């Protein structure tokens, strides 16, 4: 039992360390330290889809402030790039840990505990467009494939990912599968191609509903991308044979500029956010144009090690029935 546990831990560490090294080298980012707490009222917290409640923390020796455990570091990273004067094409990555207690369900792929490579880069002049988004996606996908090949060489786990990732807009997906739900569309397209980047998540589609929810103040999901489609963000999905479903490894996108921010808070009815310090800084042109996202560490390990439950690669909290069902929950 001890031997199996140690081997399990070594596999997880190998995936995380290998991916980190490749990501830093290929994406050309530096690894930095990030916070676990965000001060309430400065606008730095990531509100995700807008309905999740963060964990509140009161610090004894800072009585006049309330803090929250971060959901992600989407806004903090952009603030940090500006604060320390990162140049065009430069960026950072954080070994981010967070809590999301309002997950809809605790299942094979969702946990209260979130660990991800949270990264952000300053966009080179004139490249705030879909082409640059795709180029960055291809770089990250290359890192995923290189890590998979390293796992194959070390642990004899067969590599399954295609050499290329397929790009498709959510608006195209609705037209292609008009009678399917968003999740069913993801399953259909990802099973066909093996690896997909789904472009444009957050805006209302021709069927009157968004593919999925996104907060209005980090990704740009309203700007036109190409051919009348909208959204400069998306998700990297791979086909997970163990689960028989599409499997999200990363959510990322070009971040809002001043116009996209104002447009999107009008759509979502979150105009009050513009009074926060972070949002004022953006509107006053104090932040660089950036691209960024999060890549799930436990999800990456789960996929590359062919595990059936995320609890096999991270230590979290689970209902007893989950522990009774899966022998290798940590």
UniProtKB/Swiss-Prot annotation:
Pathway: Amino-acid biosynthesis; L-asparagine biosynthesis; L-asparagine from L-aspartate (ammonia route): step 1/1
Main location: cytoplasm
UniProt GO cellular component terms: cytosol
Catalytic EC class: ligase
Entry superkingdom: Bacteria
EC number: 6.3.1.1
GO MF assignments: aspartate-ammonia ligase activity; ATP binding; catalytic activity, acting on a protein; transferase activity
Catalytic activity as recorded in UniProt: L-aspartate + NH4(+) + ATP = L-asparagine + AMP + diphosphate + H(+)
UniProt cross-references to CDD domains, sorted A to Z: AsnA (cd00645)
Record Gene3D superfamilies: Bira Bifunctional Protein, Domain 2
Any GO BP: L-asparagine biosynthetic process
Keywords on record: Amino-acid biosynthesis, Asparagine biosynthesis, ATP-binding, Cytoplasm, Ligase, Nucleotide-binding
Pfam families xrefs: AsnA
Family: Belongs to the class-II aminoacyl-tRNA synthetase family. AsnA subfamily.
Protein name: Aspartate--ammonia ligase
């Amino acid at each position: 039992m001890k031997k199996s546990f140690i081997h399990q831990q070594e596999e997880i560490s190998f995936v995380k360390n290998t991916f980190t090294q490749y990501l830093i080298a290929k994406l050309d980012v530096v690894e930095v330290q990030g916070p676990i707490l965000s001060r309430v009222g400065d606008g730095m917290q990531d509100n995700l889809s807008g309905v999740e409640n963060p964990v509140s923390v009161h610090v004894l020796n800072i009585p006049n402030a309330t803090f929250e455990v971060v959901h992600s570091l989407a806004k903090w990273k952009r603030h940090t790039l500006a604060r320390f004067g990162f140049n065009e094409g430069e960026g950072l990555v954080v070994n981010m840990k967070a809590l999301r207690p309002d997950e809809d369900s605790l299942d094979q792929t969702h946990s209260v505990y979130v660990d991800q490579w949270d990264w952000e880069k300053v966009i080179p002049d004139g490249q705030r467009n879909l082409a640059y988004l795709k180029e960055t996606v291809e770089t990250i996908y290359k890192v995923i494939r290189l890590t998979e090949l390293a796992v194959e060489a070390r642990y004899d786990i067969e590599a399954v990912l295609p050499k290329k990732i397929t790009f498709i807009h959510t608006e195209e997906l609705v037209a292609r599968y008009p009678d399917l739900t968003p999740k069913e569309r993801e399953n259909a397209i990802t099973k066909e191609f093996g690896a997909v980047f789904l472009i444009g998540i957050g805006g209302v589609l021709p069927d009157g509903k968004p593919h999925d929810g996104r907060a209005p103040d980090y990704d740009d999901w309203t700007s036109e991308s190409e051919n009348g489609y909208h959204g400069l963000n998306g998700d990297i999905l791979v086909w997970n044979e163990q689960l028989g479903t599409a499997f999200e490894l990363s959510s990322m996108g070009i971040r809002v500029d001043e116009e996209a921010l104002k447009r999107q808070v009008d759509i979502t009815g979150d105009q009050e956010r513009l009074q926060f310090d972070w949002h004022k800084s953006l509107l006053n042109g104090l932040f660089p144009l950036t691209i960024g996202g999060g890549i799930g560490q436990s999800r990456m390990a789960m996929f590359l090690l062919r595990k059936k439950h995320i609890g096999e690669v991270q230590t979290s909290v689970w209902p007893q029935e989950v522990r009774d069902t899966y022998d290798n929950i940590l």
